[in-house]
Amino acid sequence: MWVEENESMALPQALENYRKQYRKIKLFQDISSVLHWDSEVMMPEEGREYRSTQIAAVAELTHEWMTDPSFLELIQSAKLTTKELPESERSLWNRELEILMEEKEKADKLPSEFVAEFAKLTNLAHAEWAEAKKEKNFKLFSDRLEELVHLSKKQADYFGYTTEPYDALLDTYEKGAKADQIQILFSDLKKSLIPIVAKAPKFESPFKKPIPIANQTKFCNRLPSILGLTTKESRLDISNHPFSTSLGKGDKRITTRYSESDPLSSIFGVLHETGHSLYESGLSKMPNWPNPLTEYLSLGIHESQSRLWENQVGRSLPFWEFMYPILLNDFELSESELPFQELYKYINSTEKSKIRVEADQVTYNLHIILRFEIERDLINGKTKVKDLPEIWNTKMKESFGMTIENDAEGVLQDIHWSMGAFGYFPTYTLGNIFSAQFFKKFTEEYPDSHNKFASKGDFSDLLSWLRKNIHSKGKILTIENLVSEATGEPANAKYLISYLEEKVKEVSISK
């Protein structure tokens, strides 16, 4: 049981001292998030160099505070004090301090100058990646990527590993995950996905004319509040690559990008990022925020929240029964110009795509498997940066039967490597597995939810279920225990496969 502290429950001084220093570190980490958000959304181009220096300075400062011996003394003193607490409080405090010590031990392995260098390099790399993508020329980014790969390998060496360097990086996003285990999971998943892809129907776009950005913006601005993220605690902007970030309590930022020829891209981008922000919003509502227990559990769990709202909700019939008339109004279209059945079938169409973020939910995981294989070999030294375009294009031909025309639609399409985020990609598919299982359990407990979705656009039952079973748990439980407690069983990919098979069957019947 979680015991919330209040003014009448004064903390022992040792716990108060530890929390004060932790929250100082957290405060500056959030300041760094503000700098990052601004650099992607608002900052003029010529501010990049100095902004990189600012970000590096904050990263170095927070790292020095985290690794300072005096902070360790505060943690150790706090741990001794917990022995005097009642059992109901002691177990949570011990878990909190255990998590923090794991983070501190990891931070202790990285020199401060390395942290500053990595932070500055990734901020500079993003601008060069964006320019290279715009020019469709990998060579404009390859030298910087070479530096990022070098530093990422160095980071893996600092962290240490048993089997391969990639494991050390994977662990930073999904604690305890191992590349060889992921490989087995992905191989089995791929075998199940291939026959689904083969029988899945493809539908043509029902949009016969471009949809102005202003109309798309009007519709997209409605989505977060409909799902449960209020305008008082969030805002939606435009960026080169959709993302979401938490700048602190009551301040969640979402971005998307718009295309007049593909209005669904912005819509599903907003649904996805809103899912992330709803999770962060739920975490910040936990008692005694901020502390190590009120952080997100893993990126796999984080992605489960975004993919659930994007797919299980956003591609469902009840969701579009409610949103369809609103879409017509905002897009200034008639029913004859955009028939409901054509729209719904297209939303759930399966078609091999060159672009991951525009991929349907059936083939999406094949994109993740491709990226996992490439970045694993890259970090493990089996692949060279200069060969990435050729390797990428070959794998796309093998997996999708598609020819890549330029680097922008190939190796440069994703932002992740410019962030030094090697090991991130597998968490998307883990998130898909978790989300299907979570949603299945929710519908069992709330069998009438689809009616509330369709008739009222009421998603409060779902959000409440997620708040209770996922968001409010923070890092209190392990990943395995969270999934088991929420669904009654360990994580199982069968729910994702079943969901995809049922979805393909549904739209095939209506064909």
Predicted features along the sequence, with ranges:
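C-terminal, non-catalytic "cap/extension" segments appended to globular domains
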Residues: W2-L11, D30-S33, E46, Y50, ...
